[in-house]
Amino acid sequence: LVLAHDDMYFCPEWDAVFFNELQNLPENSDFFLSGTMVQPFESYINLDCGKTIDEFDEEKLLKNLPQIKFNDFQGTHWQPSLIPIKTWNKVGGFSEEFSPGLGSDPDFNFKLWNLGVRLFKGLSDCRVYHFSSLSLRKKAWNNGAKTFLLKWGLSIKFFKKHYLRSDKNFDGLLLEPVKNFSYFFDLLKNKFSFFYHKFLNSF
């Protein structure tokens, strides 16, 4: 099952990269693979080829993309992503409380983590150009970060840093979070934030 946003342009060979990676995975395993987003602002791969479809410079993108080096990484850029349909069904897909979409990707990933998935791998050569949530801008934004915090007791940032090790170079299956000073300090901040939103900010 391939998941993607409706404001993404899929770059050449994206599907071949996914397919080749699948050949290296054990049959019937649960996993989460993601591609790499190219965006017109400072982020993962920064290359400004237009912020709207009317401004889109496809020629510039296709000319410059092969020259940009990027490593496979831990965690995920959320979408585009590839997962087994059986894995999607095990966790019930996206959670409706995050509609219209903000926060749904990290929530989905945390459900996969709780299922036991430990292969969260970002593929550097599976690339999409992302115009950055044009569809969501037309809708009311939900507070996905707050919803995630109240649901799981952790922030999205904490999950990405200590669980997914997001944006670190890929070096194999993820392990349980390293419970060092940074972990407990960030966890304490999470608990204060949870208490505030759960009990104080509700009045």
For every predicted segment, state its role.
Residues 13-32:
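Conserved donor-nucleotide/metal-binding helix-loop-beta segment in metal-dependent transferases, i.e.
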Residues 18, 74-83, 87-92, 98-126:
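A short, conserved alpha-helix in the catalytic core of glycosyltransferases
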